[in-house]
Amino acid sequence: MPGVASNSDDLALIPHSPTNSHTIALHHTVKPPISRLSIAWARGNSLRVAVIRKPQAGESDDEPGGQVVEVKLGVDEADIYEAQWRRIAYGSVTPFAVLQSRKNLNTNAYNADLPAYVIEYSREINSLLGNQKVLPDPVIEDPKTVLQRVDEPTFSKAAWELMEIFFADKQSDGWIPERLVDWLSDYDNLIHGEQPTIYSRLVDFQTELVNLQAVEEDPKYWDVLSAALAVGWLDIVVKLLRLHSSYQHNQIGSRETENGLVETVVVLVSKMPRLRPNLSAGKLGECFDNKPDFVKAWEKWRGQITKLDCSAFWLQCGHQDTREGLKKLLQIMLGNASVLSATTFHWVELFIGHFLYIRPFTVGMESMYNLAQKCMQFKPGSSPHKLMELLNGILGENTEVVLAECSRSFGSWMITHAIELLTAGSTQADILLHEERNNLGGICIEELHRLVYAQVLSSHALTWQIAPIYLASCKKQGMGLLEILLYKQPVGHNQVLLKNIEICRMYELDNVGANAMKIAGVHHWKHGKKGSGVFWLQQAQDEFRLNRIAQQLFDFVGKSVSDESFKQWEGLIELLGSQSKAAGGLDFLHKYRDFKRSLQQVTDIACIDAARKASEALILLMKNPSTPQRFWLSLLYDSVKLLNWKERTLLNVPQTNLLLNKLQELSMARLRPDFIEADLPPQALSSVRLALATNLGRAILEE
Amino acid sequence: MAANNPETLQIHRIPQSTYIDAVRWLPPLSVFERFILLAVSDSNSDASLLEIRALNRSNPSILTPLSSLQLASRTSSLKVCQTPHKPLIAASSFSGSVRFLFVDNVEVGFDGSEHIVPEKSLHVGPISCIDLGGNELECVSVGEDGRVGLVSVGEGELSVRKVFDSAGLVSYSAVKWASPTEFVTGGLGFSVQWWDLRKPGAAVSQFKGNWDQGASSGIVHSIDIHPSRKHTCLAGGSSGTVFTWDIRWPQQPIVLSGAGQDAASARSLSASEVWEVQYDTFTRSSNHRISSTRVLPVMMCSEDGILAVTEEGEEPIELLVEPCAINCFDIDRQNPSDVICSMEWESVAILSRA
């Protein structure tokens, strides 16, 4: 918080302790002695340090007096991570913008299509966070590979999917438990901390599996089997059961009953009824999308399990481990709470087990929340985990907790985009997020988070241009901050300037765009790029500054324009145009060029047409109020040969009078102290006067 | 026209982790792979690089890095030219230097030899555009400082000379060779200048259309000249403007897009900056009577994310519509059906038309 400064460490917002300090070496090439260091924030997470040295006597001027070095803080973040983050930021622009415009289409009426739009948005954002694509299967399938190899899932994706399940996906409200089963199977590997999870146990077991001859002899085999069954990873259970050595050809004769029992359990597991519309490929179970059918199938399935449990075949099964292990699996499927609790590790695993085998019809947040609380009591000691805290907040229907968790653990990108899901999820959350708050300066929580995210985007050279999309969606402060953002961009660089103008065009900030052009115009002018300066000031229609620079240009012209160097001016004069009003007196240069050009063509007496044209141009110039006074004499001096034209007079009486009047005016002006004397030979004035008088005389005679 | 059918257009978007300043195809050096030249700038390390990448013909979504070279400053313009021995690369920078490099034919990569025109020797401040061509492999360069430079790339030393210096009274933003002795520049106010090295001192011809009515004026960002029609130059610039200027009829440009004076004949494809234009040799003109006054099909890319082919009096074909700017594209000379373009959001796209 700016302005909060304190002398005592107790009051400091971030307590400073010497152990926390971090040394960064500063590389510069400035020779000592260094007299001063100046430190300022640069873009993003970097500091700009100016190293200034004290000039020593007797040194050449070539020695640089200082250097500006940029120092990146927090360099330990991996490069690829940054790029990945930017990719997500870029990718989320379109879904966000599309959703906003759809929401804005009809703000008053209830938007019946909104849920469909929100889920579309959610899926698009979800796909940005990484695809859980299964890597291509090896050519020869290894029967002992139980776990499928998947790309490393991310916490953000897990969090997003959790919110999608509860807030956005209204269609699958009826089978939230099954969606949670899927969610856990994708992300169980993320929730382990100090405590193991089923996934970590499976991974451990898989490494041991290669060395095992008879898997059923190992108690771990039965442990992971029941654990995987408890959270509904049926495909893994079946795969593991098929590794049972009773399936081997040399044993099948002697262990027929045992093998029969194993296979019956396999069939029962793979026939488990599931209350969901479909299953992805490779997953097992029988789907039912309505309750009555499911209940019927469930009762039947349970009946089959009970029947098997009481069957006489168990007595004939000689292998004790197999018998006990399979019985345990049956107990899980029959929903024995204590067995479930014993086989799972984390409370969320137990939670899922309850959904699958004890309370498949759990609906409503309250019952889910109570169940979760109960599971936590059974499995205490789980270290706090960001995904679990988030799940807790969601189940407790506590929007504040969800917001706080999103913001604390996943950053501003997540919260800005997840708010769309939250507001779609419930009216209560919608009201909470859209309520204008006095303590936030009259903006709502939604706007606050968008502004923060836009600030993060603005701090990077590559993402600042997507910040306007988020700022524009903020009703109260957005446009003001957008203007500030645009004003902060360096305009000396053409690419940035054009981007700036483009954004101004899109958001109808004509005034800001014009100001950027003016700043750029002055910048270029000061750096000697006169053409660019004039161009941008013309684009901005800034007559005031054009007039100012016109004066400077005339000084320059007055000194330098010879017939030769007019070639240099050609481009600028073309740019100024002939009739454009915004040129601020600069159109004089255009006429001056025309006059000079026709004068050049007057080489001898035969060029009467050119001479006539030149004298017309002269009259035009002299009549034009924008012709600066300091050029009058040089113009007249240049045209002495026109005035003294042998054959006939080129200027009639009124025209000559006009020129004489101008000459008179000039003589008066010379008395003023600020008059600038043209760079002409001393006899120029008298020769012009003489020529004009002669011409007047001849013209009167001719008339 | 063929490209209109989405089934015949394959697009591969390849995300990068750096900003791409420029992208060019390299001439074919191998049967199995294609090669691409990228000028990138890494925002993390503030490094600018020139990279050669290999593109697998069978799987065009993988770009394998082959060779890379650190540059002192960001690349403002990048050109490739096939010489009798090996491809020559010229890259100009925002700090005013030009770098010439050769590509090794056998072990595809930079061959180690390079020539540099240092900063402030030819241009002060950013060089806006360069082009390779001319009599005996010359590089013409233009800059915001209003200078026009010419660098002869011989075997050994570079010879540098200034063709023109406007001392900042104008700025140039685009350049293209028209013939071994002529070239065309473009700049502010949609101005286009025709230069002839045999007539030194100033531009031979100036074109500045009468854009004052209606839409405001703009900057020419890119120029192309078709080798078979050297009298016509194609230019693209601000406000979605694409026009051609025929030096035989110097007062009338043919407007292909934007700057809506004649809205009926010129459909505006884009409303913002057109960053690059090239004649599209792949799209066959729908009008079979080939007349020399008719403008050949043109490809353009724009700030508002459009890559399209347009032809005089025809409905334009949009090849790509992106949510971000398309900064640069290149049509493969040997395989005109293939186009590579670079996007503002750190990615490149490879398009193959059939």
Q: Where on the chain are the PLM-derived regions?
A:
Chain B
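Canonical WD40 repeat/beta-propeller blade segments in eukaryotic WD-repeat proteins
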Residues: 18-27, 73-82, 124-132, 167-178, ...
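Beta-propeller domains
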Residues: 2-13, 30-68, 99-110
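Blade-loop segments of beta-propeller domains
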Residues: 59-86, 115-117, 124-127
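Blade-level signature of beta-propeller repeat domains, shared across WD40, Kelch, NHL, RCC1
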Residues: 328-354
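Loop/turn-rich, solvent-exposed surfaces of beta-rich toroidal or solenoidal domains
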Residues: 267-314
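Conserved beta-strand element within WD40/beta-propeller blades
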Residues: 35-41, 89-93, 139-143, 183-187, ...
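Per-blade loop-tip surfaces of WD-repeat and WD-like beta-propellers in eukaryotic adaptors/scaffolds
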Residues: 3-4, 54-63, 86, 97-117, ...
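Conserved blade-ending motifs and adjacent loop-strand segments that build the rim/top face
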Residues: 15, 254-280, 314-334
